[in-house]
């Protein structure tokens, strides 16, 4: 998008258009989470170990992170509509090819490709912020994040349902077709933006390093967000291990249904956007960190009481999603003309937390069981608290 678009007065976005963008965010981001409830189904289908199937979850986050680092920065340089649609088409074909995986190499390769292209949501969010009037920008980010969160939530339920009644391959094939159809819709509805001729590809990537070096506030918010996402990723990756084993013995579909608890994230994203817009950033931060920290108490009893487990999941999900919206609004204020690049730096670090959380879940479960997972959540939450409080003190100076 050109600088002119970012700096001139723009009319309020229509509710239908915001809904369209939010749906696109959910569709794209959700595909990176299909394999979380499918670990045991993939293991059985391909004849591989649980840890090998679980590593596909880690690779999904790595692929998404690579896309964030390499492609999202181009949102400040290229025509955003072309970039978004191209990424959706690439992701769609990768998902279709993933559905034909017959060995571990194909599973891993096309998992990375599919999630590499799924980052179009991360181009769309700063785009929506840039074309919004300043007074509604925070609320728009919250609504788009609500769509993204809903996509992630429903993706697990969709994957569990299709896998239980058809196969895990059908999950990716059907999603690929839907994504292709939606890419066509996005091409007709999204506004076209001119390429920024003042930027070059090399200059864009250099500016990422410059942002990382000169904006410690950005790095601190990203690191705090990454640890929060590590908590959530750990909770949802280990959910299959907890619920598919005694005493619950849930199916893929039942695990996906349990994941619907994450619907709380829709309300927390919207609430956070509105509350931050009123200037209550510190209140949001303290509440969110408290929820993530104290979620360890009910999560400790996950294998004994399903209600306690549900409460812990709700607390961690609300805390992380609201905290993420807070962080995005804080870092977008750094430079309105570089929001795609700022988002790239923030989200690359943020999604490294997802990979860390997934990897920690697999490793901790293998070596220490559920108690190892809960201890890891507590460590991550303490890290968030320390980084967040230090950042707020630095910003007050």
Over which residues does each language-model region extend?
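C-terminal transmembrane helical hairpin of 12-TM major facilitator-type secondary transporters
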Residues: 282-327
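Helix-to-loop junctions at the C-terminal end of transmembrane segments
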Residues: 68-79, 268-281, 365
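Conserved MFS/SLC helix-loop-helix module at the cytosolic interface between two early adjacent transmembrane helices
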Residues: 66-104
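Intracellular juxtamembrane helix-capping segments at the cytosolic ends
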Residues: 120-132, 322-335
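Cytoplasmic helix-loop-helix junction between adjacent transmembrane helices
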Residues: 111-147
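Helix-loop-helix hairpin linking two adjacent transmembrane segments in secondary transporters
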Residues: 106, 143-190
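Structural signature of the two symmetry-related core transmembrane helices
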Residues: 82-96, 283-298, 378
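Juxtamembrane intracellular "pre-TM" segments in multi-pass secondary transporters
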Residues: 3-12, 191-222
């Amino acid at each position: 998008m050109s600088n002119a678009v970012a700096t001139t007065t723009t009319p309020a976005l229509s509710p239908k258009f915001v809904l369209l963008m939010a749906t696109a965010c959910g569709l794209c981001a959700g595909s990176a989470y299909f394999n979380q409830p499918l670990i045991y189904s993939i293991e059985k289908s391909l004849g591989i170990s649980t840890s090998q199937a679980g590593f596909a979850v880690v690779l999904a986050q790595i692929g998404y992170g690579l896309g964030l680092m390499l492609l999202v920065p181009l949102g400040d340089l290229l025509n955003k509509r072309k970039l978004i649609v191209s990424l959706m088409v690439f992701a769609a074909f990768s998902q279709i090819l993933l559905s034909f995986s017959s060995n571990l190499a194909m599973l891993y390769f096309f998992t990375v490709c599919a999630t590499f292209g799924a980052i179009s949501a991360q181009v769309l969010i700063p785009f929506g912020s840039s074309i919004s009037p300043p007074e509604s920008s925070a609320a728009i980010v919250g609504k788009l994040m609500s769509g993204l969160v809903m996509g992630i939530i429903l993706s697990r339920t969709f994957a569990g349902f299709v896998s239980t009644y058809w196969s895990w391959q059908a999950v990716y094939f059907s999603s690929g077709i839907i994504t292709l159809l939606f890419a066509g819709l996005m091409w007709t509805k999204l506004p076209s933006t001119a390429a920024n001729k003042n930027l070059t590809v090399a200059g864009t990537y250099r500016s990422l390093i410059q942002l990382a070096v000169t904006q410690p506030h950005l790095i601190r918010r990203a690191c705090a967000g990454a640890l929060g996402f590590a908590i959530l990723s750990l909770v949802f990756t280990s959910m299959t291990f907890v619920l598919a084993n005694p005493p619950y013995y849930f199916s893929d579909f039942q695990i996906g249904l349990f994941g619907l608890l994450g619907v709380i994230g829709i309300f927390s994203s919207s609430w956070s956007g509105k509350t931050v817009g009123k200037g209550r950033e510190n209140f949001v931060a303290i509440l969110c960190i408290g929820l993530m920290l104290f979620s360890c108490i009910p999560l400790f009893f996950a294998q004994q009481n399903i209600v306690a487990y549900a409460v812990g999941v709700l607390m961690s999900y609300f805390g992380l999603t609201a905290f993420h919206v807070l962080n995005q609004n804080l870092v977008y204020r750094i430079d309105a003309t570089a929001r795609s690049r700022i988002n790239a730096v923030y989200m690359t670090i943020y999604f490294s937390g997802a990979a860390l959380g997934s990897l920690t879940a697999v490793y901790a479960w293998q070596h220490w069981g559920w108690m190892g997972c809960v201890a890891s959540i507590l460590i991550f939450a303490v890290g968030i608290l320390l980084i967040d409080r230090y950042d707020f003190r630095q910003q007050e100076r």
